[in-house]
Amino acid sequence: MEEQQLGAALDKSAAELSVMDVYDIAAALGLELERVIERTGAELLSRLVPRVVRVLELLEVLVSRSSSSPDTDELRLELDRLRLERLERLEKEKKHKKELELVEDVWRGEAQDLLCQISQLQEENKTLLNNLSIRESPLTEEDIQKQEGMTERERQVMKKLKEVVDKQRDEIRAKDRELTLKNDDVEALQQQMSRLMKINQDVRHRVSVVEAQGKSLIQQKVELEAAAQTQQQEVSSLRQEVSRLKEKLKEQSRSNEEEAQEPVGPPSPAQEALCDEDLSTVDLKDPNRPRFTLQELRDVLHERNELKAKVFMLQEEIAYYRSEEQEEENGPPLPDPSETLRTNPRSNFQPESGIKRLFSFFSRDRSVSQRRMMLNVEPVGDAVGSWTGKQEDVYTETAQEALQHM
C-alpha cells in the first residue's frame, strides 16, 4: 500500500504535488532506509539521513508556497484592477482641474480687460463732464447726439460684459457639478476598495488558519507513525532478548541435567556413613526426597540469581521506554494557529518538522544498541550477591509478571 502511494505521488507533476504527497514520499523513504539499516547497520547511513531530511523539508516548503488558493489570486487581481481604475480617475481629475484653472485664468484675463475698458470709459466720461461744466454753454444738437452715442456705446459694452460673465458663471457651475459627481464616484470606489481589502484579509486569515491546522494534523500523524514504528522495533528487540534468555535458560538446564547424570566417583568412608544415615532417615518412596548435592544446589541458585538480575535489568529498561513513550504522548499542547499567525512570522525560531520526527528512529536505535551493550558488559556477580531472603522472592515474582506481559 505504501509503495502504491509512493508511486502515485511520484507520478504526479510538480504543480499537482501537495504536502501530503511529500509526507508519503518521506514515509516510503523512511521504510526503505529502515530496511537498509536492518541489513547493513546505521553507521553507513549516518551522514546520508540528515541530507535526505533537509531535501524533503525544502520540498515541503516549496509545495506549501505553491499551493495558494485561487480565491486569493482572484481577489488580488480585482484589487489591482481597482487600483488602476483609481489611478486613472485621479489622473482625469487632475486634468479636469487644470482645465478649470485655465478657464478661470482666461476669464480673469477677460474680466481684467473689460474692467480696464470700463475704467477708461469712466475717465472719458469724467473728462466730458468736466468739459461740459467748464463751457456752461447751451448744448447744441451735435453735442447731444455725441453724448447719446457715447452712452449707447457704453451700454453695449456693459451688456457684452454681463453676457460674458453670465456665460462663464454658468460654465463654472457646470464644472463644479461635474467635480462633485466625480468626487462622489471616487468616494464610493474607495469604500468598495476598503471593503474588498477587508474581505481579502479575512480570507487570507482563514486560509492561513486552515493551513496551520492541516500542518499540525499532518505532523501529529507523522509523530504517531514514528512512535508506532519505534514501539514495534522496541517490542521486537525485547522479544528477541527474551527468546535469547529462554534459550540460555534451556541450555543451562540441559547442562545441569547432564552434570547430574554424570557418574560419581567412589565415596569416602565418612560420606558413606552420612549417606547410610540419610538413607535410613529418608524414605525411598517419597517423591520429594533430595536428589542433588549441596554444590549443585549452590550452582543452581547462583544461575537463578544471575537470571533474576538480567530479568530485573530488562524490566528497568522496559519501564524506561514506557516512561519515554508517556512523555512523548503527554507532550506540550499545540498552540492556537491564529495566535501563532498573529505573531511575527519572520522570527528566527523554526519548529521541528514532521520529517525530522519521522526519521528520529535512527537515533533511538543507536541509543538502544548502546544501552544493550552496556547491559551485556556490566558484571552480574555484584548484583547477585546482594539479593537474598525476601528480596529474591519479590524480584522473581516481578520478573515472571514481566515475562507474562511480554
UniProtKB/Swiss-Prot annotation:
Residues 241-257 have a biased composition (Basic and acidic residues). Residues 234-272, 323-351 are annotated as: Disordered. SUPFAM superfamilies: RILP dimerisation region (SSF161256). Residues 105-319 form a coiled coil. It is found in: Cytoplasm, Cytosol; Cytoplasm, Cytoskeleton, Microtubule organizing center, Centrosome; Cell projection, Cilium. Gene3D superfamilies: 1.20.58.1770, 6.10.230.10. GO terms for cellular component: centrosome; ciliary basal body; cilium; cytoplasm; cytosol; membrane. Residues 5-99 form the RH1 domain. One of its GO terms (biological process) is nitric oxide mediated signal transduction. Keywords: Cell projection, Cilium, Coiled coil, Cytoplasm, Cytoskeleton, Protein transport, Transport. InterPro entries: DZIP_RILPL (IPR051241), RH1 (IPR034743), RH2 (IPR034744), RILP_dimer (IPR021563). It comes from the Eukaryota. Its main location: cytoplasm. Residues 289-358 form the RH2 domain. GO terms for molecular function: dynein light intermediate chain binding; protein dimerization activity; small GTPase binding. Signal peptide: none annotated. Residues 340-351 have a biased composition (Polar residues). Belongs to the RILPL family. Plays a role in the regulation of cell shape and polarity. Plays a role in cellular protein transport, including protein transport away from primary cilia. Neuroprotective protein. This is RILP-like protein 1. It comes from Danio rerio (Zebrafish).
